[in-house]
């Protein structure tokens, strides 16, 4: 059976589609260079593990799995990231339907949710992500911070929306002013996609 490897996906929109909030230059470098680096990194670890297993060689499993988690986490989180954004004339605003009802239930209001998610993004230490998740055991929405990319599958939690707050995600457009980038993000949130991710869980 042939073994498969990761490939860089195409974006669901042109590189200039998120302007003026994310420039074409910023998005192109983020996708073609940084996301590609996680693809290459993950595939490199997989090949190293494959070779060691085929040849009966020893491998530092702890180091290999940490490196694999980092690169696969980066690969997967970026898939969510590209998908939960879109052109400002089609996106932004507030969610509808079941997701809106759960935000009201769990946070009190959309404005309260937006404030807490923004605070999570701005306050993430160093490089990381703000993530909206859903816990099936408690039937609740959760906001989480992810350090770097080292996130593995957490049972009963499903990722709904992510915001990349690594500096490579915004430095060309916003320099070191992360709060401005976070505020701009709300203009390009693709709520239809986030709603679909949530509805698909029921």
Swiss-Prot record:
Domain of life: Archaea
Pfam families on file: Sod_Fe_C, Sod_Fe_N
Residue pairs linked by disulfide bridges in the UniProt entry: none
EC numbers: 1.15.1.1
Co-factor(s): Fe cation
UniProt enzyme class: oxidoreductase
InterPro entries found in the cross-reference section: Fe/Mn_Superoxide_Dismutase, Mn/Fe_SOD, Mn/Fe_SOD_BS, Mn/Fe_SOD_C, Mn/Fe_SOD_N, Mn/Fe_SOD_N_sf, SOD_C_sf
Stored PROSITE patterns: SOD_MN
Binding site for Fe cation: 30, 78, 164, 168
Catalytic activity: 2 superoxide + 2 H(+) = H2O2 + O2
Record note on cofactor: Binds 1 Fe cation per subunit.
Record key words, sorted: Iron, Metal-binding, Oxidoreductase
Gene Ontology molecular function: any one: metal ion binding
Transmembrane segments: none
Subunit note: Homotetramer.
Family: Belongs to the iron/manganese superoxide dismutase family.
Main function: Destroys superoxide anion radicals which are normally produced within the cells and which are toxic to biological systems.
Protein name stated in the entry: Superoxide dismutase [Fe]
Protein source organism: Methanothermobacter marburgensis (strain ATCC BAA-927 / DSM 2133 / JCM 14651 / NBRC 100331 / OCM 82 / Marburg)
Name of the coding gene: sod
